[in-house]
């Protein structure tokens, strides 16, 4: 019973850390990376379709993304979708290849992005703490129903606290790496 609670808490904490990594990969740094456009959808046969399903996105160099559209008809729609996104990018079309130059980030924009990234990290820390609280309340329920002893409860709570500390440390490491990446000029 205690092992199930610990395992569930561990899985949920790992998912929180992965979700943070995924969210932070979409935050624009000075470098071109295909995941930057992963949140963009294109109207294709009347349905919004993720960009990576209608085109191939690669980093041409450190400051340019190259998008090869599979269907020539979609080139303008892809360009429009990129312009309409809130990424502040200006695509240039050359046949079926669309090049997206990334403008250098200003110091002010970098600081804004760091604030956003810190907010995301704090949200993940809160999620991890909520998972800890849920696991501890499950343990209290077992203790109340006399399915575990007080010693087992205390030991299990210590184990959950260790899991929480590890998850928060991972979040802090991800945050520090992203902040460093953002502040590089």
From Swiss-Prot:
It is found in: Cytoplasm. The lineage of its organism: Bacteria, Pseudomonadati, Pseudomonadota, Gammaproteobacteria, Vibrionales. Keywords: Cytoplasm, Protein biosynthesis. NCBIfam families: frr (TIGR00496). The keyword Cytoplasm applies. InterPro entries: Ribosome_recyc_fac, Ribosome_recyc_fac_dom, RRF_sf. Disulfide bonds: none annotated. GO terms for molecular function: ribosomal large subunit binding. Responsible for the release of ribosomes from messenger RNA at the termination of protein biosynthesis. May increase the efficiency of translation by recycling ribosomes from one round of translation to another. SUPFAM superfamilies: Ribosome recycling factor, RRF (SSF55194). CDD domains: RRF. GO terms for cellular component: cytosol. The keyword RNA-binding does not apply. Belongs to the RRF family. This is Ribosome-recycling factor. The gene is frr. GO terms for biological process: cytoplasmic translational termination. It holds the Pfam family RRF.
């Amino acid at each position: 019973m205690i092992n199930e609670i610990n395992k569930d808490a561990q899985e949920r904490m790992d998912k929180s850390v992965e979700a943070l990594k995924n969210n932070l990969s979409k935050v624009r740094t000075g470098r071109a990376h295909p995941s930057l456009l992963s949140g963009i959808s294109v109207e294709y046969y009347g349905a919004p379709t993720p960009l990576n399903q209608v085109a191939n996105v690669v980093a041409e160099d450190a400051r340019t993304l190259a998008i090869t559209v599979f269907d020539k008809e979609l080139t303008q729609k892809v360009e429009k979708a990129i312009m309409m996104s809130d990424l502040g990018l200006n695509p240039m079309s050359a046949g079926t290849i669309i090049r997206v130059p990334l403008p250098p980030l200003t110091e002010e924009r970098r600081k804004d992005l760091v604030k956003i990234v810190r907010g995301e990290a704090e949200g993940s820390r809160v999620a991890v703490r909520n998972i800890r609280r849920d696991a501890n309340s499950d343990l209290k329920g077992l203790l109340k129903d006399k399915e575990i002893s007080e010693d087992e409860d205390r030991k299990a709570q210590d184990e959950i606290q260790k899991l929480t500390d590890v998850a928060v440390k991972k979040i802090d490491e991800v945050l520090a790496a992203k902040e460093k990446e953002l502040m590089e000029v």
